[in-house]
Structures are given as C-alpha cells and as structure tokens.
Amino acid sequence: MFRGNFETSIDAKGRTSLPAKFREVLVDSFGDERFFMTNSNPVRLGDGGYSSGLVIYPYNEWLALEEKLKVGTGLGLSSAELASVKRRIVAPAVECVADKLGRILVPPHLRKSACLEREILFVGMLNKAEIWSQAEWEKVFRQDIENFPIDSPVLAELGL
C-alpha cells in the first residue's frame, strides 16, 4: 500500500521522480510497474473554491475503475454526473511507467490542472497515490482539519 508523504520538485518540462517506496509498492503490492495518472477528485475548500491534484492508480486498479465507470449502473450517479467524472478523470488519464532511474513525465495538461510548478508532494493514500503542488496541499490539508470527523464512532471502531 502507498503510505507517507514525499517532497520533491518538478522541472519545467514536467520531469520528476516517483518515490522509490512507491515504485516498490507498484511492483510488490500490485504486480505491475505501470500506472495511470490523472486528475484527482476536486476538494471543496471552505472559501467556496476548489483544489485539485493528480492521482496515480496502479495499472489493474485503474482498469477495474474504468470497468465500473463504463457500466455506470449502481454507482448512484446521474448521467450528467457520470459524464462529468469521465471527462474530469478518465479523459485526461495517461498510462505511465518510471524509467530505470525512477523518473516520470507529467504531461502539460495534467501539470496545468494541478497547478504543478516547482515544489510538489507525493502523498500515499493506500491503494493509490496523489501528487500535489505544495501550495495546493497546504490548502487541502487545512480543509482536512475542518472536515475531520472528530469523535466519530467509525474512527473509534478503527482504533483511530
């Protein structure tokens, strides 16, 4: 599973390094070095705005997600909502693999949508990983504090 936060940088051409731990997880936990990169779900901020990063799905996790979205039934989404998800998440997705040195290329359309300019952060999210600009991550992390389910019986049950 993907765990931890890793600060790094991205250059003007969109090159960055996938953390070594994440490369290991792709192969050891998911059996494939390939992955898909796309926009993450937008996060609603307290000021009424939105923030978004990128998300990395292991290859087979992505294929399973595509199948669910292709069928579309039983997801609880209207046809307009499903179309929005497909346009926002599926359409910009790119298949990737890190080179021997662990470098990946983030395409311009994804860099732009996630506001990735220089300092970035890889965030482990168990079965997927996220990529955020440092500035956007700080906004989202502050919002997470607001959204955190304090005194939740579910969290207590989990031991959190």
UniProtKB/Swiss-Prot annotation:
Keywords, sorted A to Z: Cytoplasm, DNA-binding, Repeat, Transcription, Transcription regulation
Subcellular location: Cytoplasm, Nucleoid
Pfam families to which the protein is assigned, alphabetical: MraZ
Any one GO CC term of the record: nucleoid
CDD domains for the chain: MraZ_C, MraZ_N
Annotated SpoVT-AbrB domain residues: 5-50, 93-136
GO biological process: one example: negative regulation of DNA-templated transcription initiation
UniProt family annotation: Belongs to the MraZ family.
Protein name per UniProt: Transcriptional regulator MraZ
Taxonomy of the source species: Bacteria, Pseudomonadati, Thermodesulfobacteriota, Desulfuromonadia, Geobacterales
